[in-house]
Design a protein with these regions (language model features):
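Carbohydrate-binding surfaces of carbohydrate-active enzymes
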Residues: 71-85, 89, 97-113, 118-129, ...
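Short, solvent-exposed loop/turn and secondary-structure capping segments
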Residues: 5-6, 34-36, 42-47, 123-124, ...
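The substrate-binding groove and active-site-proximal loops of carbohydrate-active enzymes
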Residues: 1-15, 53-76, 112-126, 159-166, ...
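Aromatic-lined substrate-binding rim segments of carbohydrate-active enzymes
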Residues: 1-46, 50-51, 133-138
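A cross-domain feature marking catalytic cores of carbohydrate-active enzymes
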Residues: 1, 33-37, 113-115, 147-149, ...
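An active-site-proximal structural segment forming one wall of the substrate-binding cleft
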Residues: 13-35, 54-108
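Noncatalytic carbohydrate-binding groove/subsite architecture in carbohydrate-active enzymes
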Residues: 122-216
Length: 287
């Protein structure tokens, strides 16, 4: 979307990231920015531009001699992204003409480097994920950086988050021992899963979601509901799950979200709102 040709960036129209983040602030919401370079299987090639695969012998999402072209492209892309949003971080000075109702320069309170890098390779974790963290910092990221990797690997300069559906209360209590210096944070509480062509829609009830959110709060942790509004994968932007080559994700990315694909409230919305209001009032007690 942002770099359809090498080195040619677009941040206009539907790719206007800066305006989107400003709208978040104008509505009084905070933003966890996930610039990638890989952003998840729901996007075609995880959001990576297809031209990366034309680099001779290239390897993606790694740090080795064959991945040099990928790393150079990642550094260039993250630099362009940070140029758009670095003054929209909560740590930046507030401009006099801001529409944001929040303190600071903007709503960005956290950034995520990469996504779901489930790889048992400590050296790669430091040389690849560590490089992504470095690119963000050197280009002006001042807010905390997370890596949503479920503790497969620790990365200097970032703290890890959790993403799972089961055993949340016990797992999050163990996080206190594994990462005592950082908050316990579930970066993806999935109220539903993406639909795949040729398969029935997976439905998760509001009670199911409430149970998971309750477990998280009981462990003194925080959560981010993903997706809160699923939207639509227009054109050929839908991705593919890793379980098979033909597990293609539909154009609908509703994912059972509290706000439907059309923007309507659902029973899930009212359930999530109720427990979130409770958490906001009793957060100090729960922590």
């Amino acid at each position: 979307v942002h770099e359809t040709e090498p080195g040619e960036f677009s941040f206009e129209d539907e790719a206007d990231l800066r305006h989107f983040v400003q709208l978040i602030g104008a509505e009084g919401m905070y933003c966890i920015l996930r610039p990638g370079p890989y952003v998840g299987a729901s996007w075609d090639l995880g959001g990576l531009p297809p031209w990366l695969t034309t680099i001779p012998g290239v390897t993606l999402r790694q740090s080795n001699p064959a991945a040099q072209g990928f790393l150079e492209a990642s550094a260039r892309f993250l630099g362009a992204v940070m140029e758009q949003v670095k003054d929209l971080q909560l740590t930046a000075p507030a401009p006099p003409d801001t529409e944001s109702t929040l303190p600071g320069g903007g709503p960005i309170v956290m950034m995520q480097a990469e996504h779901a890098w489930f790889c048992h390779h400590p050296a790669q974790a430091q040389t690849y994920l560590g490089e992504i963290v470095r690119y963000l910092r050197e280009n002006g990221c001042e807010v905390p950086i997370i890596v949503g990797n479920n503790f497969w690997q620790r990365v200097d300069g970032a703290f890890d988050t959790w993403s799972a559906d089961e055993h949340l209360a016990t797992d999050l209590r163990q996080m206190r021992l594994v990462q005592p210096e950082a908050p316990r944070f579930v970066s993806e509480v999935q109220c539903g899963q993406p639909d795949h062509w040729g398969e029935p829609h997976e439905h998760r009830s509001a009670a199911w979601c409430l149970n998971r959110l309750g477990q998280i709060l009981s462990a003194g942790a925080q959560y981010n509901v993903h997706m809160f509004h699923g939207g639509t994968n227009f054109g050929f932007n839908g991705g593919c799950s890793d379980r098979s080559r033909d597990a293609l994700i539909t154009t609908s990315h509703d994912c059972g979200a509290p706000l439907s694909e059309a923007g309507d409230t659902t029973p899930m919305y009212w359930a999530v709102k109720r427990i979130s209001m409770f958490a906001s009032q009793f957060g100090q007690v729960l922590a």
